[in-house]
UniProtKB/Swiss-Prot annotation:
The modification Phosphothreonine is found at T11. GO terms for molecular function: haptoglobin binding; heme binding; hemoglobin alpha binding; metal ion binding; organic acid binding; oxygen binding; oxygen carrier activity; peroxidase activity. The lineage of its organism: Eukaryota, Metazoa, Chordata, Craniata, Vertebrata. It comes from Ovis aries. Belongs to the globin family. The modification N6-acetyllysine is found at K58, K81, K143. Gene3D superfamilies: Globins. Pfam families: Globin. This is Hemoglobin subunit beta.
Length: 145
């Protein structure tokens, strides 16, 4: 999946990421840009417009939770399927989340990282992160296969 150099680049960069802010924004943007994903979060309260979503404390808290799990995956890049096995089972068997949503969230995460880190998030680093988010999405979709 990733070369040793790519792993070093993404893990080194990840240490600079403000997980709470980036997670909140990434999940919020997912819910705004792809509104059909909101059906999994109806219990979060007001998701009626972009401002409501982006300022919703439950969206922010869950976004941090999502990125905390992603952070754990960053520590286990060689075993993403094992790392995300329980979450894959939960999202497949209990929550019935369309696995395409994992890919969408990964792409939104890359946008948010670029927004937060500007020129430091180089095209090469973006390419490396695209590999990571694809690997995480595949690991989360593993139970579906």
């Amino acid at each position: 999946m990733l070369t040793a150099e790519e792993k070093a680049a993404v893990t080194g960069f990840w240490g600079k990421v403000k997980v709470d802010e980036v997670g909140a924004e990434a999940l919020g943007r997912l819910l705004v840009v792809y509104p059909w994903t909101q059906r999994f979060f109806e219990h979060f309260g007001d998701l009626s417009n972009a401002d409501a979503v982006m300022n919703n404390p439950k969206v922010k808290a869950h976004g941090k939770k999502v990125l905390d799990s992603f952070s754990n995956g960053m520590k286990h890049l060689d075993d993403l399927k094992g790392t995300f096995a329980q979450l894959s089972e939960l999202h497949c068997d209990k929550l019935h989340v369309d696995p395409e949503n994992f890919r969408l969230l990964g792409n939104v995460l890359v946008v948010v990282l670029a927004r937060h880190h500007g020129n430091e998030f180089t095209p090469v680093l973006q390419a490396d992160f695209q590999k990571v988010v694809a690997g995480v999405a595949n690991a989360l979709a593993h139970k579906y296969h």
